[in-house]
C-alpha cells in the first residue's frame, strides 16, 4: 500500500554578496540550494481517439534544486530605476513518490529522472520605472522563463517529456500618487497576447487589464 506524502520544503537556503561599482549601481550575486518533498506537478493524459487532453493527474515527487543568479539595480536620481535579475537552476530528481510502484506506468513516468516537470531551467525578471513627476509614474514589468518540460501520456506511444515554449510576459502600467500613503494604478498584462502553457494544454489568460489601489502603512 502507498499513500500521498505531505508537500513541504525542509531546506531553502541562499548565500551571496553585493557589489557597488558605482553610486547608482548595485549588483547582487548569489547561489542557493533547496530540497522539496512531495512537490506537486501536473501530468497530462490524452484521449485515445484525439489530441485533446482527457484529464490531468496531480503527482508528487522529491527533488533537489541548486541555483545561481544575479540581480542588478540601477537608478538615475529619482527619475529612472531599473531592476534586472536572473536565475539558472540545476535539478536532481528522486523517484516519483505518488505513483503506485505496481502501476504499469511507474517506469515510464520517471523518464530517466532527468526532468522536473513544469519547472523552468532559467528565468529572468526585468522592471523599468520612470517617475514623470512627484505624482505620476509609468513602469514596465516583464518575466521570461524557458527550458520547461511537461509529462504527457499519449496513446499508443506512451509517456514522454514534451518541451513547452518559453514564457514571455510583458506588462506595462501607470501610477498616480494621491499622497504619501495612497496611490491608484492601471496595468495591461501580457500586451503581446502571447499565451503560454501553465502546464501542458492549460494556457495562461493572454492580454488582460488590472486596476487597483496601493496603500502604505
Describe these PLM feature segments.
Residues 15, 29-35, 84-88, 140-144, ...:
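Transmembrane beta-barrel strands of outer-membrane/channel proteins
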Residues 15-21, 70-74, 86, 126-130, ...:
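Residues on the lipid-exposed face of transmembrane beta-strands in outer-membrane beta-barrel proteins
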Residues 23-29, 78-84, 134-139, 180-186:
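Repeated loop/turn-to-beta-strand initiation elements of outer-membrane beta-barrel proteins
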Residues 123-141:
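Gram-negative (and chloroplast) outer-membrane scaffold detector with strong preference
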Amino acid at each position: 500500500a502507498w499513500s500521498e506524502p505531505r508537500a513541504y520544503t525542509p531546506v531553502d537556503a541562499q548565500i551571496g554578496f553585493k557589489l557597488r561599482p558605482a553610486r547608482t549601481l548595485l549588483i547582487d550575486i548569489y547561489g542557493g540550494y533547496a530540497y522539496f518533498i512531495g512537490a506537486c506537478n501536473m501530468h497530462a493524459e490524452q484521449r485515445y481517439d484525439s489530441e485533446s487532453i482527457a484529464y490531468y493527474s496531480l503527482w508528487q515527487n522529491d527533488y533537489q534544486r541548486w541555483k545561481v543568479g544575479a540581480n542588478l539595480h540601477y537608478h538615475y536620481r529619482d527619475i529612472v530605476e531599473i531592476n534586472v535579475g536572473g536565475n539558472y537552476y540545476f535539478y536532481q530528481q528522486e523517484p516519483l513518490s505518488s505513483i503506485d510502484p505496481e502501476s504499469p506506468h511507474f517506469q515510464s513516468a520517471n523518464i530517466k529522472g532527468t526532468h522536473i516537470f513544469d519547472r523552468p531551467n532559467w528565468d529572468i525578471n526585468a522592471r523599468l520605472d520612470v517617475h514623470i513627476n512627484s505624482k505620476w509614474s509609468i513602469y514596465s514589468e516583464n518575466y521570461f522563463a524557458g527550458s520547461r518540460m511537461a509529462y504527457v501520456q499519449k496513446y499508443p506511444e506512451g509517456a514522454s517529456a514534451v518541451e513547452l515554449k518559453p514564457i514571455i510576459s510583458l506588462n506595462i502600467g501607470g501610477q498616480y500618487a494621491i499622497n504619501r500613503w495612497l496611490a491608484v494604478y492601471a496595468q495591461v498584462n501580457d500586451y503581446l497576447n502571447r499565451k503560454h502553457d501553465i502546464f501542458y494544454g492549460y494556457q495562461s489568460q493572454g492580454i488582460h487589464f488590472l486596476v487597483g489601489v496601493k496603500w502604505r502603512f
